[in-house]
Design a protein with these regions (language model features):
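Hydrophobic faces of well-ordered beta-strands that scaffold small-molecule active sites
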Residues: 38-43, 78-80, 110-114, 163-167, ...
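Aromatic-rich peripheral "rim/lid" segments of glycoside hydrolase catalytic domains that contact
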Residues: 51-55, 263-269, 281-297, 301-342
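Bacterial N-terminal signal peptides
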Residues: 7-17
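Active-site cleft segment of glycoside hydrolase catalytic domains centered on the general acid/base Glu
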Residues: 92-97, 101, 122-228, 232-236, ...
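N-terminal substrate-binding region of glycoside hydrolase catalytic domains
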Residues: 30-109, 115-144, 150, 166
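Bacterial Sec-dependent N-terminal signal peptides
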Residues: 2, 15-33
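Active-site beta-loop-alpha junctions enriched in small/polar residues
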Residues: 43-46, 83-85, 115-119, 167-172, ...
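Acidic (Asp/Glu)-rich catalytic clusters
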Residues: 32-35, 65-74, 98-109, 153-160, ...
C-alpha cells in the first residue's frame, strides 16, 4: 500500500491532464447481486484516525460511528490488515482484534489481511519482520505457520471466524523477501503460502484463503504466479486482486480485469475477488461510475465473490492518501453510493 501514497499524487496529475475522462457508468439491467456478494471496505486506519481526533459524518452532517455510516451505504464486509510488530502499535494483532470485534458486533463479515511484515507489504516491498530476519528458511516456514495460528486464535478467542484470510498482501513477486521472492525461488514462495494455508485451516476449515496480487488487469502476471504456485503444490481458495484506475482508464481496465477474472475461474477453478479498489476522492462521480461497473462485472463472473474499497474513510489528507471516498468534511462522497446496489 505504501506505493499508493506516492502514486496517488501522480494519479491526480494524470487525471487533471486527461482529455478523455468518462464519468458515466454503463447502464445495467435490474439484476440483483448474487447471494452473499461481499460489498466491502478496508478500514484498518479507523482506530488510528479516531485516536488522532478525526470524526466521521453521515451525509446529513451528523457525527456517527464510521462502521454505521458504511453499513448505511450498503457495506456488509470489513477487511482488516495485521502487521507483526509495528513500531506504532497500530494494526498489530491487538488493534486488529479490537476493530474486528466492533465490526462483528455490527453484523459485518470479516476479511483478515496478513502482511507478514512489521510495515507495509506491497509489490515494491516485502520486508521480513525484524524478529524473523535471521531465521533459516525451514524455521521461517514454521514461524509463518505459528504466527498465522496465533492471529486466527486471537480472533477465535473473541468468537470471530474470518470468512476470508489473505496469506500475504499484494504478493506480485512473493513475500518475506529474499527467501520468498517468487521470481527467484517460486518453490520457496509456494511453501510459505502453504504454511499459511495449513495454519488457517487448522483453526477454521470454513475460512477461505486468498492469494492477493495487484494490477487485476494483468493476466500475464496472474497466470505466471498461479501457474507457479500450482506447479509447486500450494493451495488456495480465492484469487484476490487490486485495481486502482484513473478517470481516463477505468473502462478499459475494468474490461481487462473482467477478462482476467473469467480466465482465473476457467484456468484454476477458483473463486475471485477484488480485495482492493480505489480512485481519487477528488473525482467522486468518476469513482462512482467505476465502482458501479466493477461491482456488476464481478457479479457477472460465475465465481465472483465481491469488491472491497481500500480505506474509503481516509480524508483530510490522512497520511497523504488521496484515493479515499470521503470528502474534506469527513462525509462519504457519492462514490460510496455504488455500494447501495442490492
Amino acid at each position: 500500500m505504501r506505493t499508493k501514497f506516492i502514486g496517488s499524487v501522480l494519479v491526480c496529475v494524470l487525471m487533471l491532464n486527461s482529455c478523455t475522462r468518462d464519468i458515466s457508468a454503463p447502464e445495467y439491467p435490474d439484476v440483483p447481486l448474487t447471494a452473499n456478494f461481499a460489498k466491502g471496505a478496508d478500514v484498518s486506519w479507523m482506530t488510528e484516525m479516531e485516536a488522532s481526533g478525526l470524526k466521521f459524518y453521515n451525509n446529513s452532517g451528523t457525527a456517527q460511528d464510521l462502521l454505521q455510516i458504511l453499513k448505511d451505504k450498503g457495506i456488509n464486509s470489513i477487511r482488516l490488515r495485521t502487521w507483526v510488530n509495528p513500531v506504532s502499535g497500530w494494526s498489530n494483532t491487538e488493534d486488529m482484534v479490537k476493530k474486528a470485534v466492533r465490526a462483528k458486533t455490527m453484523g459485518f463479515r470479516i476479511m483478515l489481511d496478513i502482511h507478514y511484515s512489521d510495515v507495509w507489504a506491497d509489490p515494491a516491498v516485502q520486508t521480513k519482520p525484524a524478529a524473523w530476519a535471521a531465521q533459516p528458511f525451514v524455521t521461517l516456514k514454521t514461524t509463518v505457520f505459528n504466527y498465522t495460528v496465533s492471529v486466527m486464535n486471537a480472533l477465535k478467542d473473541k468468537g470471530i471466524t474470518p470468512e476470508w484470510v489473505q496469506v500475504g498482501n499484494e504478493t506480485n513477486d512473493g513475500m518475506l523477501w529474499p527467501d520468498g521472492k517468487a521470481s527467484v525461488n517460486m518453490k520457496n514462495y509456494a511453501e510459505l503460502v502453504q504454511s499459511g494455508y495449513t495454519a488457517v485451516k487448522s483453526v477454521s476449515t470454513t475460512s477461505k484463503v486468498i492469494v492477493h496480487l495487484s494490477n487485476g488487469y494483468d493476466n500475464t502476471l496472474f497466470r505466471w504466479m498461479f501457474d507457479g504456485l500450482k506447479a509447486n503444490g500450494a493451495n488456495w481458495d480465492v484469487i484476490g486482486m487490486s485495481l486502482y484506475p484513473v478517470a481516463a482508464t477505468w473502462q478499459s481496465l475494468d474490461k481487462q480485469c473482467l477478462s482476467n477474472m473469467n480466465d482465473m475461474v476457467a484456468r484454476y477453478d477458483k473463486e475471485v475477488m477484488l480485495c482492493e479498489v480505489g480512485m481519487p476522492a477528488a473525482e467522486p462521480e468518476a469513482s462512482r461510475a467505476f465502482l458501479t461497473d466493477i461491482i456488476m462485472k464481478t457479479n457477472s463472473v460465475s465465481k465472483g465473490l465481491g469488491v472491497f474499497y481500500w480505506e474509503p474513510e481516509a480524508y483530510n489528507d490522512w497520511q497523504g492518501y488521496k484515493l479515499g471516498a470521503f470528502d474534506v468534511t469527513g462525509k462519504p462522497t457519492v462514490a460510496m453510493d455504488a455500494f447501495l446496489v442490492k
